[in-house]
C-alpha cells in the first residue's frame, strides 16, 4: 500500500506496527548520525581560566567553529494520490477515535500519521541540551581567552619582588633571576619580576629589627643567606611568623684556608684545639713549626657568609664537656675570637690577601683563614700558582656546613602576587639546570660532580654538625657578636694554694697563666683583679678597659704587678662572701655590649660561716638580672668539698665549671684562656 493511503483489507495489524516502528527508527537514525558536543562526549571537567589550556591563542578565531552545525529536520512530503488539505489537522489528537479513524487504532480518517509524544519530548530535550552545552562552552572559552589575554598583557600592572642573597652566592642567583624573568608568566593579571640584591646576614637581620635600610631596596619576599644560622637569628629577632618556608639549596663545608706549610702540621688537630693554638705563644713549636709562635687564625665576617659563626659552633661543640650542650663551650669561642689577628678590616678579601702576601710565612700576620670550601675554590681559580701557595684543612669530626637555605618570608609588605612570585623563583632555583650552574661555581650539589681544583679535592664529608635548636644557634651566634667587643671580667683569685706542682706552687702556676692571657687580650677588654684568703676579700686592681691606664700605669702592667706580689697562704678561704661582693659590684657597673663575667680560681674549702653554699645559690638566684647577665666561671682544683656549690652557681649564672687535678698541665692555660674570652 502507499505510504499515506488507507490500509488495505489484507494489511494486518502487525504490518501497521512494523511501519510505525520503521518510521521511528528513521528519526532515531537522523538524530544519532550527528556528534553533538556534550551529549555523548566524555566530560572535560570544569572549565578554568588557569592551567587548563596550554596557551592563549590555542583556539580558532570563532569559538563556534569547534563544534559541528546541527542540521535542520529533513523535509518530507506525503506520497500517494491524496491531496494535502489546505489546513492540516492537528498533529496530536486526543480523546476517543470514531469509527472512521484508523482501523485497529493506527490511522485516522484524514490519512495523517501522528508522532509519539515521547519521541518529540526526547528530541526537544536533546536540542536544548546541545544548545546549552554549546553556549556554556562558548562563553567559558571566551572568558578563558579573555583572562589569558588580559594576564599576558599585564592589565593589572607590573611589579617586582625583592630577593636578597648572601654575597658569596649573589652572582649566581642574579644569573638565575635573569633567565627566570625572561621565561616566567604572569601571576594572576600582574607581571612580577625578580630583583636580586647582595647583602650580608647582619644587615638583613638588623633591618628587620629596626628600620629597613634604603640601600637594600625593598623588603624581600625571598632571602638566601649563607646558612640556617641566619634564619635562626631572624626567627629569634622577628618571631617565627617572619619565615613561611626554609630549605637548603646547596652546601659548602667550613674549613681553614692555610699556607701549604701549615696544612700537614694541623693534620692531627681538631676544632677544640684551635683556641689553645691561637693563644699559646709557642703553640706551633709543638707541631714542628719552630719560629712560628702561636697560630694566627683570621675569622672574617664581611663577605664570608656565616663561616665564622659556623666555625664558632664547631669550636663550642668540640670544647664542651661530654654530655653538655654546645653553649658550655662558649668560653672557647670567645677565646678564639678575642685572640684573632687585627687587620685593616674584617673582610674575607683582606684576610686572604694578607695570608697570600709574599714574604716569610712563619712571621706573617695571618697563618690561616676560616672560610667555606666554595670561597676557597673561587680564590684558587684566580691564582696562577695556587697549588704551591694555598692549601686547606678540614677539621675531622662532624662538618660545619653552610647550607644556603631559600627562606620565604612573610609580612604585610608583600602582596599575594609578590609572595607567589617569590615562591615560584625559589622552586626555579631548585631545578636541576640551575643547581648545575651552582655546582660549577664550587658549591656542592647532590649527585653532581664537583669541578676540578688545585686547592681542594672536594673530599667526602662525615656527618653534619648539629648543635641544637634555633634558639641555641642564635645564642651562640650572638655570643660571637659580643665577643668582638671583648669581655668585661673580674678575676677572683684564691691565695690559699700552697701546693707544690711541677716545681712551683699552685698559686705561681696560676699567676703565670693569668699573665700570659692578659697580654693576649684585646685593648677593649675590661679586666679587674680581686684576691681573697682566710680573712677577707680585697680589690687589687679595679675593673676597667685594658687601654685605660691605672694611676699613670698601663692597666696590663698594673695587673701583672699585682699578680706578681701574691704569695701563698695556708689558712682557709672566704670565697662565698667575696663572690657576693664582686657580683653586686658588677651589677652596679654592668658593661653593655660586652660579655660580663667573674672568673673564680680556688681550691677550697670555704670557711666563712656567715654565708653557706645554699645561701650563695639563693643569692645568685635572686640577684640575677636577665637584662644584665653575669656568668660565674669556676676553675676548681682537686677534691674541693665545695664542688657541688660551685657547679650549682655556675649553672644558675650561665657560666661554666671546670675541675683540674693539677696546675702543672696545659689544661690550666686552656681553661684560663677560655674563661677570659
Swiss-Prot record:
Bias type Low complexity, positions: 51-64
Main location: membrane
Location of the region described as Disordered in the Swiss-Prot/TrEMBL record: 1-87
Coiled coil (UniProt feature): none
InterPro entries: VWF_A, vWFA_dom_sf
Membrane topology: Multi-pass membrane protein
GO cellular component, one term: extracellular region
SUPFAM superfamilies the UniProt entry points to: vWA-like
UniProt-listed SMART domains: VWA (SM00327)
Domain of life where this protein originates: Bacteria
The entry's keywords: Cell membrane, Membrane, Transmembrane, Transmembrane helix
Residues passing through the membrane, by range: 115-135, 192-212, 313-333, 474-494
Extent of Basic and acidic residues compositional bias: 17-29
Subcellular location: Cell membrane
Record's miscellaneous remark: Was identified as a high-confidence drug target.
Descriptive protein name: Uncharacterized protein Rv1836c
Organism from which the protein derives: Mycobacterium tuberculosis (strain ATCC 25618 / H37Rv)
